[in-house]
Amino acid sequence: MTDASADALTSPSNSGASQDTSQQNAVVLLSGGLDSVTCLYWAKARYAKVTAVSFNYGQRHNSELVAAKSIAGQAGVNHKIIDIDIAQLGGSSLTDHDMTVPDGDADKFPTHTDDIDNQAIPNTYVPARNTIFLSYALAVAEVTDANHIVIGVSSVDYSGYPDCRPEYIEAFEVMANLATKAGVTGHKLHIQTPLQKLSKAQTIQLGNSLGVDYSQTISCYKADSEGRACGICDSCTLRKRGFSDAGLADPTRYAG
């Protein structure tokens, strides 16, 4: 395991978080993909009670929800699937079937959020998705007495989405503590991003050390009804490169 992966395993991801979280609760955003499942297992190793939250938002790759449900069950955590019809808004190839999901190109991905201004944001970006998801997770956190919300964003190997940047996460955390009963009564909420500084390979190494079975995860933007990946979209391209760079066999089921 790399030093960065080891640090993510042993340290809280945000400096403002309490060092001792073993008696605290967490909410994990769980899509069923590689990053979010790694976050689920990371959270299970840290918090007393973990609630996983997934969203049925009209995504074309909704087989990821089947994976999320199965993985949450195996992990032994409470799992909520929330229905939100983001698809009616359009604006993303992940929700609009009239738009084409582009093929991936490993050479074009930003390697740090500083590069985002020089990159075209791909049409797989879903407008305001992380803001919507985090807002629902915030409500679940208040109901379940959770002090932590865990989300699998990264600013190293990523597709260039603006709502994956650390400054966005920091701003949301400020808002969360201004806008909630928990925040104003002294029960500070923390947005945890354990993968923020990890490459895809480092994320995979971290998950491997935590016992994640990546064969059950679905990352593909065009996964079929059986969860088989296309192998060529942005997400598949990053995932393939991650396993290769990590020196581990890729357990992904590919179509064809």
From Swiss-Prot:
<protein>
    <recommendedName>
        <fullName>7-cyano-7-deazaguanine synthase</fullName>
        <ecNumber>6.3.4.20</ecNumber>
    </recommendedName>
</protein>
<feature type="binding site">
    <location>
        <begin position="30"/>
        <end position="40"/>
    </location>
    <ligand>
        <name>ATP</name>
    </ligand>
</feature>
<dbReference type="GO" id="GO:0008270">
    <property type="term" value="F:zinc ion binding"/>
</dbReference>
<feature type="region of interest" description="Disordered">
    <location>
        <begin position="1"/>
        <end position="22"/>
    </location>
</feature>
<comment type="similarity">
    <text>Belongs to the QueC family.</text>
</comment>
<dbReference type="GO" id="GO:0016879">
    <property type="term" value="F:ligase activity, forming carbon-nitrogen bonds"/>
</dbReference>
<feature type="binding site">
    <location>
        <position position="220"/>
    </location>
    <ligand>
        <name>Zn(2+)</name>
    </ligand>
</feature>
<comment type="function">
    <text>Catalyzes the ATP-dependent conversion of 7-carboxy-7-deazaguanine (CDG) to 7-cyano-7-deazaguanine (preQ(0)).</text>
</comment>
<dbReference type="GO" id="GO:0008616">
    <property type="term" value="P:queuosine biosynthetic process"/>
</dbReference>
<dbReference type="InterPro" id="IPR014729">
    <property type="entry name" value="Rossmann-like_a/b/a_fold"/>
</dbReference>
<feature type="compositionally biased region" description="Polar residues">
    <location>
        <begin position="8"/>
        <end position="22"/>
    </location>
</feature>
<dbReference type="Pfam" id="PF06508">
    <property type="entry name" value="QueC"/>
</dbReference>
<keyword id="KW-0862">Zinc</keyword>
<dbReference type="GO" id="GO:0005524">
    <property type="term" value="F:ATP binding"/>
</dbReference>
<feature type="binding site">
    <location>
        <position position="233"/>
    </location>
    <ligand>
        <name>Zn(2+)</name>
    </ligand>
</feature>
<feature type="binding site">
    <location>
        <position position="230"/>
    </location>
    <ligand>
        <name>Zn(2+)</name>
    </ligand>
</feature>
<keyword id="KW-0479">Metal-binding</keyword>
<keyword id="KW-0067">ATP-binding</keyword>
<keyword id="KW-0436">Ligase</keyword>
<keyword id="KW-0547">Nucleotide-binding</keyword>
<comment type="pathway">
    <text>Purine metabolism; 7-cyano-7-deazaguanine biosynthesis.</text>
</comment>
<dbReference type="InterPro" id="IPR018317">
    <property type="entry name" value="QueC"/>
</dbReference>
<feature type="binding site">
    <location>
        <position position="236"/>
    </location>
    <ligand>
        <name>Zn(2+)</name>
    </ligand>
</feature>
<keyword id="KW-0671">Queuosine biosynthesis</keyword>
